[in-house]
Amino acid sequence: MIMSKSTSAPIGIRSLGVSFPQVIRTNDYWQQKYPEMVRSSPQRNRSNRAVRSSHEDNGYDLWSQEVAPYLSDPFRGNVERRVLGLDESSLDLQCQAATEALLAAKLDVEEIDVAIVASLFADNLGMDNTTLLAQKLGLNCPAWNLESTCSSALVALQNARALIQTEEYQNALVIVAHFGSNTVREKDTLAWSMGDGAGALIVDRLKPNQGVLANKIVSTAATYGAYHHQLELDEVGKPRIVTQTGENASSLAETAVDFVRTCCQEAAVKAGVSLAEIDFWVFNTPTPWYANVCTRALDIEPERTINLYSHYGNIGAVFPLANLYHAAKEKKIAENSLVLVYTNGASATAAATIMRWGDVALGTAPAPSISDRPTTIELQEIKPRDDTEQKLSLPKILAAPPEQQQQVLASYLITWLANSLQLLPHEIEPELPLIMWLDSLMAFSLKSRIETDLEISIPIKNFLGENNLTDLTQLILDRITLSNLAIVPSVNSHEISERETDRETMSL
């Protein structure tokens, strides 16, 4: 049931500016500097299978179907990323984005009532640079930091709107930045995805019926541990934060569909509109396939959204602003378009904001992509999972004759891989390194599945590197054997204790 439409004051985005580093780093950088990182991938001739509706898929199935086409690419769909050059600073980039938004709105810094800043991984370690930013811009108004990982932009917009709604302030400058390239080791494949950028917007009163209509924000605490951050010294002895894939990375895949459906559907109810009425959708895209997952989860047409991942890589909290900017620049949205923006911030919040787009002024366009990739997403053909997928449990393995246990276990693993990669079982070659089949998220998903089904713990390192399916099968079998042996003494001790008690009773 659709509720009545929002009657709140028309407050939303008045102007929008973005800023990106001058350096556009392509895959050639790693191919030339670290050729050993770039592996040739096995040939994967996909079988033709019948298409089925996305409504029959659970969240992980849908995710794995969209990941699968990228696994044959050594760079997993990464094409370009903008990274800070030696003569650039994170502060400069933020100032440029803010200046673009101010100029587009034809406002002076003295006219800004409040500034809200969300800066992820800026130059100054351990502290945000809001004060330095306000000082460099010449702001005299209150300014503070707000952070909710990749949902920071929408959370900041929600806060700015609320402050203006209560008439505490007349307008707000929101500045959002992400400098992921600073936090990853170049020889870590996670570096292939990390980009840098900044965006800014002026939040103000708009024409009647325009602006933000509703928000829905939920906790993503279930994804805590998806990324691991640690402090280390760089090559010149300067401390820095290093980001790596965490032990709970599989939760990103397992929860993605539920979060996007919950936020978008409930935001629509609050706004008094249906999802079918949305003219254009904007998703944050931390992976090449993320927009596809969201589009399929909500059953919307691909031409009603945009995917800039191939242009920017993962720019975190900046994505909603960059996507809105490019969508407006490319005339995909216009004044009075009904727009839904969705973001998912790991270990923080997922958020959906529905707005009636106003006459938004845009700052100077960033340098164009050099890869000439389309921004309209292309959905992969949905292929059904094998209905004969093997269900395995610890008792089932132990019930099999010892000489057949390894074969039973290998069949279980091959079936999981075949279904996840949309291959036929005979296409899975057990002697190839697992890294040829799995990206990091799928490796954690397989780890989680094994530990749930078989009640044993397997270190993540055994799913990566040069380990192959045969190695993994033998390791799991060894763990099961040890686990079973550990149970036997406790049972025997209990039986012995009962016998001793019987003897004592008889002797008495």
Regions found by a protein language model. Name each.
Residues 167-198:
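Flexible, glycine-rich active-site loops centered on histidine and acidic residues
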Residues 2-88, 188-254, 262, 356-381:
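Condensing-enzyme catalytic core mediating Claisen C-C bond formation in acyl metabolism
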Residues 14-17, 147, 172-178, 203, ...:
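Short beta-strand segments
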Residues 387-508:
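Phosphopantetheine-dependent thiolation modules in NRPS/PKS and related acyl-activating systems
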Residues 5, 91, 95, 121-122, ...:
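Claisen-condensing/thiolase-fold acyl-transfer catalytic domains that form or cleave C-C bonds
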Residues 66, 70, 82-148, 267-291:
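Conserved beta-ketoacyl condensing-enzyme motif
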Residues 13-15, 101, 115, 156, ...:
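Conserved small-residue
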Residues 241-303, 307-309, 390-399:
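A contiguous, well-structured pocket-lining segment that forms one wall/lid of small-molecule binding clefts
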